[in-house]
Amino acid sequence: MLVYQDLLTGDELLSDSFPYKEIHNGILWEVEGKWVVQGAVDVDIGANPSAEGADEDEGVDDQAVKVVDIVDTFRLQEQPAFDKKQFVTYMKRFIKLLTPKLDEEKQESFKKNIEGATKFLLSKLSDLQFFVGESMHDDGSLVFAYYRGGATDPTFLYFAYALKEVKC
């Protein structure tokens, strides 16, 4: 199994069990998330509750919770939304921090294509949810989520160059 860690913080953000599609010349990865239900285990013990006069589960408090699989698996932490000025400030700092961590070939490609990806994200800014890794480090990479027109499950966007592949 491959795990993808944030190159800036070491937080685990994704794994190969979630297929991705490269967009914007490979700068962004698009990953489909899914809402899943946690808890609410229905255990059949073979009894016949209607014959025993128990129409309800007495003393059972299942606490079923709906969560997004990617957010839950990698313990992503949601952040307040950014306005345009905050986002541009974040991107400048992110580019400054990430660029020296890339090899020369990747630096060239990153510098050439990050502007288009930034414009794409700015065009969706009001629809985005913002997440960071478990450490909630200020200098970490952001993970973005949005809902495509009519979709019930979120689509996540990752900065591909900010991910380090680690074999588990």
From Swiss-Prot:
Residues 1-168 form the TCTP domain. Gene3D superfamilies: Metal Binding Protein, Guanine Nucleotide Exchange Factor, Chain A (2.170.150.10). It comes from the Eukaryota. GO terms for molecular function: calcium ion binding. The keyword Calcium applies. The keyword Lipid metabolism does not apply. One of its GO terms (cellular component) is cytoplasm. Keywords: Calcium, Cytoplasm. It is found in: Cytoplasm. Pfam families: TCTP. InterPro entries: Mss4-like_sf, Mss4/transl-control_tumour, TCTP, Translation_control_tumour_CS, Translational_control_tumour_p. PANTHER family: TRANSLATIONALLY CONTROLLED TUMOR PROTEIN, TRANSLATIONALLY CONTROLLED TUMOR PROTEIN-RELATED. Belongs to the TCTP family. Involved in calcium binding and microtubule stabilization. This is Translationally-controlled tumor protein homolog. It comes from Hevea brasiliensis.
